[in-house]
């Protein structure tokens, strides 16, 4: 499975960069920052399904 290191994301303001990530919740996150914030908010229950749109 694909993994993403979110340890360097202490909830910064995310950029508008578009590099989509598909989460295990079947939602597409626009970039790593938005995905990592969602991972933190989920207490680690959200994982990466794959890179790219869901």
Swiss-Prot record:
Pfam family, one: Kazal_1
Cellular component aspect of the GO annotation: extracellular region
Keyword Chaperone: no
Residues at the site labelled Reactive bond 3: 16-17
GO molecular function, one term: serine-type endopeptidase inhibitor activity
Major localisation: secreted
Residue pairs linked by disulfide bridges in the UniProt entry: 6-36, 14-33, 22-54
Glycan attachment positions: 43
SUPFAM superfamilies (alphabetical): Kazal-type serine protease inhibitors (SSF100895)
Keyword ATP-binding: no
Record-annotated Kazal-like domain positions: 4-54
Entry-linked InterPro entries: Bifunctional_prot_inhibitor, Kazal_dom, Kazal_dom_sf, Prot_inh_Kazal-m
Localization: Secreted
Entry keywords, A to Z: Disulfide bond, Glycoprotein, Protease inhibitor, Repeat, Secreted, Serine protease inhibitor
Domain observations: Avian ovomucoid consists of three homologous, tandem Kazal family inhibitory domains.
Protein name: Ovomucoid
Organism encoding this protein: Grus japonensis (Japanese crane)
């Amino acid at each position: 499975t694909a993994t993403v290191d979110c340890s360097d994301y202490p909830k910064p303001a995310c950029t508008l960069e578009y590099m989509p990530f598909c989460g295990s919740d079947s939602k597409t996150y626009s970039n790593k920052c938005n995905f990592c914030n969602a991972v933190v908010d989920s207490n680690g229950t959200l994982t990466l399904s794959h890179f790219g749109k869901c």
